């Protein structure tokens, strides 16, 4: 709002001339500046008789040149608003006005609500870029970093305060009180009252002559500056708090969502395994049944509490939400209000899967409500308002200021974050249930395998402690059970150690060979020396072949010679016995062991095959080169006129010679 809009201006008001009529006996009446301005108020010197005659005009008296369109020749510009003396005072003070205008620009540099659009965009981006509106398992990549963020609030407004605890410090943002690690800031100048009072005073100053206005304008501008700064600080702090609480709520909600997802997977695995065990005429073991019961209780308690907390937060935020934008967002993210109404108002007992679906629906609706918060006032009369009134009986539209709106949002987000954080200790306390389903099986895909082993060991030790507390006598059965449990725990750590040592020697999953031996299809491999020197390092880490490998002869076209002569090959009895023994050996392997054995053999064969092909190519290149040299010595004509050593077979040899000469020159 421009509070200095009443600065004197030189206005242009046209002079009106009344044309002479045939029936009128008077002369044309004109309006001049000398007749229209007085010290009290302007007066128009037109008599009642002239006005009466003006009313007798008809349409036939008006012509195209009548003063009906602005800009015609009948209009003449003349300055009549301000008299000469008053205009002279302002012309003489032109330099002073320019000095005041610079001060006004500095005062208006930081307006309280100038960055509201940027805050709304950053608030929306913080919600959309999270994993909550899409898949909770998808990888999260930050699209871009906000350069001028609302969260840079502390950096811009740092205060160097030393030994000021318990004292009240006057600042331009208000009275500052420091108590421990908390800061209390109290507003000292009301915003709207100060702005309206200053505007009224500036307007009155325009009609006061010969009044020293410098001191009064300085006082008013200081008051306006302090009011703007305090409003700017409080508005930005409310936006800063809302965005900070939103970020904390996002982090807490994502952590809970990931843990609930893992609990649900374990629950589904047990519920799928249970009917299979019953079909085989054997029920679940006691530990598996106890784990399934605990998982059901933990999931039910956590999901129900989180759903009701989101429901309360949504109903409290709805009064400051723009209902039209909420309609757009729930259609984008496929949230059906009818289904939401049925999920909230249902009284039937739901299973775990249905409760999780209800929780995801409410979470999406809550985030859509946050996306619908902007700087416009919520609408009272719209179609969706009636539907929201049925879903949330306490729904009503409130007309609040921007600061109050951000404070409501910040308070609800903080309360929701505290409620979500109270669920995390429960989920972490029963995290060992996720690892007790398959006994000593360790999740290989878990990046925190060390933590998984520790958690599983603690769980088994706690179970062993609970078992020992129930025993009152020492017996052989108790000793054997204790030894078996301890051996099982030791076996877990041995499996983890072997798994880690195998991972160090295991090539990447994307290729059956190590990264140093990865072959890129870029043509003929030129660096023979460096390639062959790297092979023994890899070969030593794997068992070598005991039998020789027959290398097929390859012609110049690259096709195998033996492929053209296909014939049946019959195995001997010795081969059949070896195959049967291998079958019996492999039948005892698990799928992971078979896959590992197959990968090892493929890797060994590929290394040996590559080495033999490189030796064959090298030998062939030397033979071709020697043949050309012998033909040249005997004086035999060359078939082609090309130079020596320019064929593809001679490239590896030339590459080696070049490296050898470079080492000699160094």
Swiss-Prot record:
Provide the topology term for how it sits in the membrane: Single-pass membrane protein
Q: Where are the membrane-spanning stretches?
A: 214-230
Q: Which residues are glycosylated?
A: 374, 582, 604
Give a yes or no for keyword Nucleotide-binding in this entry. Answer: no
Write out the annotated subcellular location: Peroxisome membrane
Pfam families, alphabetized: Vezatin
Q: Which UniProt keywords apply?
A: Glycoprotein, Membrane, Peroxisome, Receptor, Transmembrane, Transmembrane helix
Query: Which GO biological process categories is it annotated with?
Result: peroxisome inheritance
Q: Which GO terms describe its cellular component?
A: peroxisomal membrane
Role, per record: Required for peroxisome inheritance.
Instruction: Give the family, as the similarity comment puts it.
Output: Belongs to the INP2 family.
The name this protein goes by in its record: Inheritance of peroxisomes protein 2
């Amino acid at each position: 709002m421009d509070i200095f809009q009443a600065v004197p201006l030189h206005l242009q008001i046209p002079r009106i001339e009344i044309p002479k009529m045939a029936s009128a006996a008077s002369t044309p009446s004109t309006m001049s500046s000398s007749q229209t301005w007085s010290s009290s108020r302007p007066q128009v010197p037109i008599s009642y008789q002239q006005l009466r005659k003006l009313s007798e005009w008809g349409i036939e008296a008006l012509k195209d040149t009548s003063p009906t369109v602005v800009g015609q020749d009948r209009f003449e510009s003349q300055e009549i608003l301000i008299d000469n003396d008053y205009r002279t005072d302002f012309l003489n003070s032109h330099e002073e006005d320019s000095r005041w205008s610079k001060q006004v620009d500095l005062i208006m540099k930081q307006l309280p609500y100038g960055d509201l659009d940027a805050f709304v965009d950053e608030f929306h981006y913080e919600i959309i870029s999270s994993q909550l509106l899409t898949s909770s398992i998808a990888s999260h990549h930050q699209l871009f970093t906000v350069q001028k963020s609302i969260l840079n609030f502390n950096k811009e407004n740092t205060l160097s305060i030393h030994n000021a605890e318990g004292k009240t410090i006057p600042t331009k943002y208000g009275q500052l009180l420091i108590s421990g690690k908390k800061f209390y800031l109290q507003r000292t100048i009301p915003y709207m009252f100060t702005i309206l009072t200053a505007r009224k005073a500036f307007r009155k100053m325009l009609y006061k002559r010969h009044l020293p206005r410098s001191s009064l304008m300085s006082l008013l501008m200081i008051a306006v500056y302090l009011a703007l700064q305090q409003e700017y600080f409080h508005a930005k702090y409310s936006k800063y708090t809302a965005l900070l609480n939103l970020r904390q709520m996002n982090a807490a909600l994502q952590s809970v969502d990931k843990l609930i997802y893992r609990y649900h997977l374990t629950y589904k695995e047990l519920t799928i395994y249970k009917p299979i065990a019953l079909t085989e005429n054997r029920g679940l073991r006691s530990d598996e049944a106890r784990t399934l019961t605990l998982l059901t209780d933990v999931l039910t308690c956590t999901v129900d509490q989180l759903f009701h907390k989101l429901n309360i937060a949504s109903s409290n935020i709805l009064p400051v939400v723009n209902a039209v934008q909420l309609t757009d967002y729930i259609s984008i993210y496929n949230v059906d209000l009818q289904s939401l109404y049925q999920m909230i108002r249902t009284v039937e007992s739901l299973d775990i899967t249905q409760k999780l679906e209800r929780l995801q629906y409410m979470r999406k609706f809550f985030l859509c409500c946050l996306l619908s918060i902007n700087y416009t006032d919520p609408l009272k009369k719209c179609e969706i308002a009636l539907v929201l009134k049925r879903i949330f009986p306490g729904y009503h539209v409130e007309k609040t200021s921007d600061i109050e709106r951000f404070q409501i949002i910040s308070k609800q987000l903080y309360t929701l974050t505290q409620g979500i954080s109270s669920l995390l200790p429960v989920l972490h306390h029963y995290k060992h249930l996720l690892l007790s389903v398959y006994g000593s099986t360790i999740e290989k895909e878990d990046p925190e395998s060390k933590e998984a082993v520790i958690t599983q060991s603690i769980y088994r030790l706690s179970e062993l402690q609970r078992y020992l507390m129930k025993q009152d006598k020492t017996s052989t059965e108790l000793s054997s059970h204790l030894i078996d449990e301890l051996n099982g725990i030791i076996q877990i750590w041995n499996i983890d150690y072997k798994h880690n040592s195998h991972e160090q020697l295991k090539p990447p999953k994307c290729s059956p060979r190590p990264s140093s031996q990865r072959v890129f299809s870029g043509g003929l491999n030129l660096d023979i020396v460096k390639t062959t020197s790297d092979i023994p390092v890899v070969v030593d880490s794997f068992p070598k072949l005991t039998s020789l490998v027959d290398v097929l002869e390859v012609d110049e076209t690259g096709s195998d010679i033996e492929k053209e002569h296909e014939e049946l090959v019959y195995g001997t009895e010795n081969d059949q016995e070896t195959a049967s023994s291998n079958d019996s050996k492999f039948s005892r392997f698990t799928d992971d062991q078979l896959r590992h054995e197959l990968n090892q053999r493929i890797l060994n064969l590929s290394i040996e095959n590559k080495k033999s092909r490189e030796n064959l190519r090298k030998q062939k290149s030397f033979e071709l080169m020697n043949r050309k040299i012998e033909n040249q010595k005997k004086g035999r004509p060359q078939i082609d006129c090309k130079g020596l050593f320019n064929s593809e077979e001679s490239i590896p040899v030339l590459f080696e010679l070049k490296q050898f000469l470079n080492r000699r020159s160094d």
